[in-house]
Amino acid sequence: MNKKVKNDMGNELIRIFEYNKPQHAIIVILFKGRRLPKYCAPMPRNPGPKINISLNNDLSEIYFSALKENASIKDGAILIQLDRGIPILRGFSYRLFPPLLKTSRLKNMGSGYNSSLDFSVVKRVICVYFINKNGVKKFTKGKEKALFKLKANKLHKFKHIMENPGNK
C-alpha cells in the first residue's frame, strides 16, 4: 500500500473516530486481489448502501451517509479493495469468521477485536483497522499497532505508523 493511501486512510479513520465518539465498534478491512477474501460473508441490508465505488478521501462521508440511510450497516465489517493503489469500497456489513490465530492475546477485548486480529492473517488481507471507544488499532499479519488513542477525553494521534513503523 503506498504512503499516500496509508495517510489518506489514516485521516479518514480518525474522522470516523472523532465523529462516532464511540457509539459502536467499526472494522475496516483493506484487501488486494480481484475476489473478496475468504472467511467473510455479506449480511443482507435493505436499503442497501452504495458500494463498488472509488474512495477519494471520503470514506467518512460515505460511511455516515450510509449509516443515516440504514443504521444496521454498523453491524459487520467494511471491505475496501486496493486496485492499483486506488481504494474501492466493496461493501458494508460483512460477517467475519476467520480461523483462530494461534497467538497470545489480550483478555476481555471482545469479538470485534479478536476477529480483527484473526482476520489480519487471511490471504490477500493487507490490514484490518479496528475503531472502538479507546481509539484506532491497525492489525497487520497478526500484529497490533495503535494508530490513535483516547486519553483523558483527548484524542492523541500517535506519530503516523507509516513514519515510525516500529512504534506501537
What would you call each of these model-derived segments?
Residues 1-168:
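Divalent-cation
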